[in-house]
Structure formats: C-alpha cells, structure tokens
Regions:
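Terminal leader/tail segments of proteins
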Residues: 1-125
C-alpha cells in the first residue's frame, strides 16, 4: 500500500539516500516501495545529538536510512546501555525499542525513541 505524503512549502523529506525539497506550494504524492522515508523534522543530526536519547535516536535513524543494522549495532548497544543507566525508569520503553531493532522494524523503534525525546524535553534541566 503506497504511503501518502503531504509536504508544506519548502519542507524536506529523506527518501533513501536522497532529500526531496518541496517547492513554494503545498503538495502531496504517493510513495510505493520499501525505501526508508523520514521527514526532515523527524531527523536528528550528528551535531544535534547532544543527549543520550538523541544519540540513540540518531544511531537507529542511521540503521534505518542506510538499511544496515550490523554496521551500527555496537554503537547502538553502547548507547542503549548508557540510556538504561541514565533512565532506569524507562526500561519498558527501551525494551520495546530493542525488540523492534531485533525484529527489523526500525521505523517503529524510532517512534518509540521519539517518546523518550518528548519526555527528555519536558524534564527539568
């Protein structure tokens, strides 16, 4: 089933190894296939990955976009342990992330980590 994507003016979306930049008007289109897709607003860059949850997200994002779990596995496991130590109360959520990684459902793992990012934003500094 194709994915329907709606983009605002000048919004960006990553499709595989390419970035699509919308023109000055709102648009929608369908994408059919297994290529990884992420909106720019749902990405974390290496430069902005400045918290344990953001570093984990960035690592899983790279697994997803590059379709290469093995390449990032060692980094992922280290970041997961770091986050488990820093946030022991998030064990269930981190367990769900790990299950998604093991099952190959990387986009679902990213969605779980986004919950951590939201909690991290709300936490007092």
């Amino acid at each position: 089933m194709p994915l329907r994507v709606e983009l605002k003016p000048f919004e960006r979306i990553i499709v595989g190894d390419s970035v699509i930049i919308n023109s000055g008007t709102r648009t929608s289109f369908l994408i059919d296939g297994d290529t990884p897709i992420l909106r720019e607003r749902d990405t974390v860059t290496a430069e902005t990955a400045n918290t344990p949850a953001k570093r984990l997200y960035h690592c899983v994002q790279m697994m997803y976009l590059k379709n290469d779990v093995a390449r990032y596995r060692t980094s992922y496991l280290g970041l997961l342990k770091e986050l488990q130590a820093a946030c022991p109360d998030q064990g269930d959520l981190l367990g769900a992330v790990d299950q998604h990684i093991a099952g190959g459902t990387l986009y679902k793992a990213l969605k779980e980590i986004r919950k951590l990012l939201k909690r991290e934003e709300r936490a007092p500094a």
